[in-house]
Amino acid sequence: SFATGRYVHQTRLWDNAMPYDGSIPGWGHALQEKKIPVESIGKLHYRAEEDPAGFDVEHIPMMVAGGVGMVWASIRKEDERVYPKGRMLGDYIGPGISKYTDYDAAVTARTQQWFASKAASNDTQPWCLYVGLVAPHFPLVVPQEYYDLYPFSDLPAVKLHPKNGYQRHPWVEKQNAMMDSEAKFETDEERLRAIASYYGLCSWLDHNVGKILNALETSGFMENTTVIYTSDHGDNVGARGLWGKSNLYQESVSVPMIMAGPEIAPGTCDTPVSLIDLSKTIAMHFGADIASSNDTKSLAEIAKNAPDPDRVVFSEYHAVGAVSGAFMLRKGRWKYNHYVGFAPELFDLKDDPEELVNLADDPAFASTLVLLQSDLNQICNPDEVNAQAFADQATMIESYGGPEAALKLGAPGATPPPKVTL
C-alpha cells in the first residue's frame, strides 16, 4: 500500500507471504517514467532484488527471506494454524547488539556515503532517496547507552492488562493466542526489560535519523530537499497484554507523519492522513502522477487546505493470527473497528484517546455506529474482502504443495538482514 497508494484489498497482497514485486506500478515507477533518479537504502521487505520495484538502485536491501515470506502464517483458521514455539520478541531481551542494530548502523553509514557522493558529483538533477531503518522492530536488543535512558522506575504503567481484570475483545484474544508474547515472559523484570528496550530502540532510531539529517545538511542539500519521516506501523508495547502490531488499536495503527522542506510551513495539520497518501505526495512532488486509490491526496495539498478533521482514514488486517478480516475506520472523533464474525468496537478518541471504553453496545451511540458502518461499506464490503483474502491465501498455500508444506516455509520470526560490507 505504501508503494502503490492502494488499499490491501485492492492490491490483494494480504500478508507477509505476498511481498510486493513491482507488478502493480507504484510511486517509484512514476518517478522513473519522469526520468527522476530514485534509489533506496535499507529495509524494503519486498520480494527480491531482481524485481522491477520502482528503484534504479537498491542499496543493501532487506527483502523477505528467500523471496517467500511467512507462508506458515497465511494459514489462519484456528484448527489449522501453527503456534510458534519461539518467542517473537527474541530469545534474549535487554542491552546489547543484534543483527538489526548492526544493520541500521550500516544503513545509516551507507546513506551518509550516498549524500557525500551525490554532493561531490555536482549533479543538479532532482533525485529521490528512500531510506529504510529497522528499529524499533524486535528482537528487543538495544545498545547499552540507549537502554540506560529508560530506568524501570521511569517507565509508564501498562494500561488494560488482563492480569488486572481487563477482558480482551474475542477477535483480539484469538489473534494474540497465536504468538502471545506476554505469556512467554519468564519474570516481571523481563517484561520491564522489554519495555525499556523498545523505548531504547526508538532512541537508537532517533540517533540514526539525526546522523542522516546531519549528513543531508553537511552535503548542502538540506535547504532544497523535502524530507518525509514515517513508519509502517506502531507497537502495542504491552498495552492490553499485547506486543507487536496485528490489531487495530491506536498503539498499533498510529504512525508518525512528518514532512519538512522548502515552502512547507511549520505547524501541525489536523486532517487525518495515512500511508497511502504518500504515493500521491511523492509522485506529485516531482510532477508525476500515479493511479492510486481515489481516497489518496498529496500531503502538501492537504496541509495547504483548511483542516478536515472528518476525513476518513481506513486500515485492514488479514495476516498473522487473524481468524477473520479486521477493518478500521477513523472519522473525526470516532474510531470504528469491524471484525468479520465478531462484535464491533467503537471509541470516542476525543474523550477517550486511550480507547478504554468500547461504546459499540451503548444504545446512545447506535446511530453513530450505523453511520460508520455505512462509511466502511463505501470503501469495501468486509464480508466479500474477507472471503477473497482467505481464497487467495488458500490458492497460494496450494501452490506451495498444501498446508503441510506451507507450514515449513518462511522465516519463523524477524526477517534476517543481509550481510553488509561498508
PLM features: what roles do these ranges have?
Residues 1-339, 344, 353-374, 403-422:
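Formylglycine-dependent sulfatase
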Residues 350:
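Residues forming the ATP-binding cleft of Hanks-type serine/threonine protein kinase domains
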Residues 363-398:
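A contiguous, mid-protein "functional segment" used to position or interact
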